[in-house]
C-alpha cells in the first residue's frame, strides 16, 4: 500500500512538472527536460498502471476485502488530487486570481488528500480502524499536508538557488528562489500579497504571474520576493502553517499512545518548529 502511494506520488509529480513547465525537481532537471514531453508523459502513465497492479497484489497480504477497501480509497485520493490540479491549472490558463475560499478548496483536494488524508486513512483501513479514529487520522493528515505545502511555498521564496547551472535557469531565473512566481503559481502567499499591496503593486505582481515563464525577468522575481516579505505576506503564511500544525496536534491528541503515534508526532514536530522559513 505504501509503495502504491509513493508510485502515485511520483506519477503525479511527473505530470505536474509538465503541466507547470517546471525545470527542476529535487535538485535535478525534470524528467521532461531530460527525455522530452512525450516520453515523460508515457513514464507517468506507466507508473499509474503499476500503482493499480501493486494494489491488486495487496490481497496476498491483506485479504481480498481489505485490499479492495484500500484500492477504492486510493482511487478516491487520485480523484480528489486531479480535481485540485484542475482548479490550480485552470486559474493559470484562464488568468484567474482566486480568493482565499477558492484557494482552500483547491489545496484540500490537491495536497490535503494525497499527501496526508489519503495515506493516514489507508493506514487506518489496514489496521481495521473505522469511525471516529478513521476521521481523526484523515483530519490530522489533511492539516499536516496543507501545512507542509505552505511551508514549501515559503521556502521557495526564502531558500537559495538549488542550482546555478545555465540549464536550470528560465527567463534569467529557474525553479529556485522565487520559482513559484516564474511559474505563475497561485499560492497563499500571492493571495496575501494581492490583499496587502497597493493597486500599482498589485498590477505589477499580476502582470508577472500572467507572463509565460520564459518571459519573466530576474529583477521581477527579486522584486516579488522582496514585496512578499515587506508587505507581511510571508509572516501571514507562516502563521497559517502554524495554525494547521495546531489543528493536526488537536487531532493527534485523540489517538492512542504508542509507536505509531510517536512517528506522527515526529512529522508534526517538524511542521510545528517555531523558526523562520
Question: How would you name each of these model-derived features?
Answer:
Residues 8, 61, 215, 231, ...:
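Residues at alpha-helix boundaries and the short loops/turns that link adjacent helices
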Residues 60, 195, 210, 253-257, ...:
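Alpha-solenoid HEAT/Armadillo repeat architecture
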Residues 197-253:
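Mobile late-domain/C-terminal helix-loop "cap" segments
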Residues 77, 143, 211-215, 230, ...:
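A short structural micro-motif
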Residues 1-202, 243, 265, 269:
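Mg2+-dependent prenyl diphosphate-binding active-site environment of isoprenoid biosynthetic enzymes
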Residues 242-244, 249-277:
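Short, amphipathic C-terminal "tail helix"
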Residues 176-180, 235, 255:
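Short, contiguous acidic/charged loop-to-helix segments that flank catalytic cores in large enzymes
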Amino acid at each position: 500500500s505504501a509503495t502504491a502511494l509513493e508510485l502515485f506520488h511520483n506519477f503525479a509529480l511527473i505530470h505536474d512538472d509538465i503541466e507547470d513547465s517546471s525545470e527542476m525537481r529535487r535538485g535535478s532537471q525534470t524528467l521532461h527536460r531530460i527525455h522530452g514531453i512525450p516520453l515523460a508523459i508515457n513514464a507517468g502513465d506507466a507508473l499509474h498502471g503499476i500503482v493499480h497492479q501493486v494494489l491488486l497484489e495487496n490481497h496476498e497480504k491483506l485479504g481480498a476485502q481489505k485490499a479492495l477497501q484500500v484500492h477504492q480509497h486510493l482511487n478516491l485520493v487520485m480523484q480528489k488530487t486531479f480535481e485540485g490540479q484542475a482548479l490550480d491549472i485552470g486559474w493559470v490558463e484562464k488568468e484567474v486570481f482566486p480568493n482565499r475560499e477558492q484557494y482552500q478548496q483547491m489545496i484540500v483536494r490537491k495536497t490535503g488528500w494525497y499527501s496526508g488524508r489519503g495515506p493516514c486513512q489507508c493506514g487506518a483501513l489496514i489496521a481495521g480502524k473505522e469511525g471516529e479514529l478513521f476521521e481523526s487520522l484523515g483530519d490530522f493528515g489533511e492539516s499536516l499536508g496543507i501545512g507542509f505545502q505552505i511551508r514549501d511555498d515559503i521556502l521557495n521564496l526564502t531558500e537559495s538557488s538549488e542550482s546555478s547551472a545555465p540549464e536550470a535557469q528560465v527567463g534569467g531565473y529557474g525553479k529556485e528562489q522565487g520559482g513559484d512566481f516564474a511559474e505563475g503559481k497561485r499560492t497563499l502567499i500571492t493571495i496575501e500579497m494581492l490583499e496587502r499591496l497597493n493597486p500599482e503593486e498589485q498590477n505589477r505582481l499580476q502582470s508577472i504571474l500572467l507572463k509565460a515563464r520564459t518571459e519573466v525577468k530576474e529583477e521581477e522575481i527579486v522584486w516579488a520576493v522582496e514585496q512578499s516579505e515587506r508587505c507581511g505576506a510571508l509572516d501571514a503564511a507562516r502563521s497559517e502553517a502554524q495554525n494547521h500544525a495546531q489543528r493536526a496536534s488537536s487531532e493527534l491528541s485523540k489517538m492512542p499512545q504508542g509507536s505509531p503515534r510517536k512517528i506522527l508526532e515526529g512529522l508534526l514536530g517538524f511542521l510545528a518548529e517555531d523558526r523562520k522559513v
